[in-house]
A protein has these predicted regions:
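Conserved S-adenosyl-L-methionine
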Residues: 229-335, 340-342, 346-351, 357, ...
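Non-catalytic, mostly N-terminal accessory regions of nucleic-acid modification and defense proteins
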Residues: 2-242, 246-247, 309-318, 420-424
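Conserved Class I SAM-dependent methyltransferase catalytic core
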Residues: 45, 52, 61-74, 363-431
């Protein structure tokens, strides 16, 4: 659209457009078609891999290995590209980090960790580990050491919390991979080869955000096949886009975005696509209570090329132990929190005096935390900000404490609109929201 506006093409009927404008429209249409074709091809390939590799292991349990190996390949190639570009700009035109000795690579460690947030020695890059994997009788141990070294590379640095534990769920010694070391290593070789053969490099060089797109697709498929548990970590793309669009009406940029129950981060990352990540000036913030899903969220940030210093995802219970007191207020807050979750409520005498909840004069019921999330979001919203939250319909009509909280919200004109979504939109539930 920007191209068309610059050439004054967008305001004319198609039959009156000049040749140059028609050619640009044709190019744009062809580009969109190419993107969809590449995306469809990538999706077919990666889901086939996920199904072929898991064997008798439940897909939901095996997802950690597919997603973890995808992450390992991404950070390896991302780091290699960064170092190669830097060296080649300096005049070393034939430089290739993958072929550098580990000893020489050590000289750049400190500066690279400061910039990229992690470091991988050449011998431990995905491409080099894969090249030797088939003949490595101790491949499981090799990978365990590599993952440990990647995590240790950031100890004491600003990015330590962003990388810590990201490989914990990828247990290379698990019986899920096989009953013997030999069987596990065979599965790991297949996994390395399958992820390595994906044409992600070609896609990244051309028209789609390949690594991030592959990750989002895999999580969509895992959520749709996991039933109820899938909805705990993933918000459908259509809903994510709606929430993001609502919060940025009339805005071309925001200071920070926040999700207090961020799951895998799909809602937060929608802002990077809708606004452009550079227009979320101070970054992406979230908190997730489930440790495995918290790890998935941080991986998702890296795979969408969000630098470590531009996101802050915390682990813990947002309602009783919020981690971002020093980061609020936020211009845009979005969330799809768990429906009617139990929480401490008046069982914790400190909460009634918590500045997030005290303005309403009551706490959300112990068995229904829905409006506790709403009050938390309202408290951390900037004066010019907008929040959009997915709620269980019961918050609109239930009595007791929830009725009093609703009255507080309405009397103070905090509610702009209520939108009813269709049933069957969310994984694992048929209820409307």
């Amino acid at each position: 659209m920007e191209i068309l506006e610059e050439k004054n093409c967008s305001v004319e009927p198609i039959n009156t457009l000049n040749k140059e404008c028609k050619e640009m429209i044709s190019m744009a249409n062809n580009l969109n078609t190419t993107k969809e074709q590449e995306r469809a091809e990538l999706h077919r390939a990666i889901w086939q891999i996920a199904n072929d590799l898991r064997g008798s292991v439940d897909g939901w349990d095996f997802k950690q290995y597919v997603l973890g190996m995808l992450f390992y390949r991404f950070i390896s190639e991302n780091l290699t590209s960064y170092i190669n570009e830097d060296e080649r700009r300096s005049g070393n035109k034939d430089f290739d980090y993958t072929k550098l000795s580990d000893k020489k690579a050590e000289f750049g460690r400190a500066d690279t960790v400061k910039e990229k947030g992690f470091y991988i020695l050449p011998s431990e890059l995905f491409v080099n580990v894969r090249a030797k994997a088939r003949h490595d009788a101790n491949l499981n141990e090799t990978l365990a050491v590599v993952f440990r070294n990647i995590e240790n590379s950031v100890k004491g640095s600003d990015s330590e919390d962003d990388l810590k534990g990201l490989f914990d769920d990828m247990d290379v010694n698990s019986n899920k991979l096989g009953g013997t070391v030999e069987q596990r290593n065979k599965k790991l070789v297949k996994l390395l080869d399958a992820i390595g053969d994906l044409r992600l490099g070609e896609y990244a060089d051309n028209t789609i955000d390949a690594f991030g797109d592959a990750y989002e697709f895999l999580m969509t498929m895992y959520a749709s096949t996991a039933g109820k548990s899938g909805g705990e970590f993933f918000t459908p793309q259509e809903v994510s886009e709606l929430l993001a669009e609502i919060t940025i009406v009339g805005k071309k940029e925001v200071n920070k975005v926040y999700d207090p129950a961020c799951g895998s981060g799909s809602l937060l990352l929608k802002f990077a696509k809708v606004l452009g990540k550079e227009n979320v000036r101070q970054g992406f913030f979230g908190q997730e209570i489930n440790l495995t899903i918290y790890n998935l969220c941080r991986i998702n940030m890296f795979l969408h090329d969000i630098n470590y210093n531009h996101f802050d995802v915390a682990h813990g219970d947002t309602l009783t132990d919020p981690k971002h007191w020093d980061d609020e207020p936020f211009d845009a807050i979005v969330s799809n929190p768990p429906y009617s979750k139990e929480w401490e409520s008046d069982g914790n005498p400190l909460l009634i005096n918590d500045p997030r909840f005290s303005p309403a004069g009551v706490l959300a019921p112990k068995r229904r935390a829905d409006l506790a999330f709403t009050m938390h979001m309202l408290s951390w919203l900037s004066t010019s900000g907008t929040a959009a939250i997915v709620e269980y319909p019961g918050v609109l009509y239930r009595g007791g404490a929830e009725q009093k909280i609703r009255k507080y919200l309405i009397d103070n004109n905090y509610i702009d609109t209520v939108i009813q979504l269709s049933p069957d939109l969310f994984f694992g539930t048929t209820i409307a929201t």
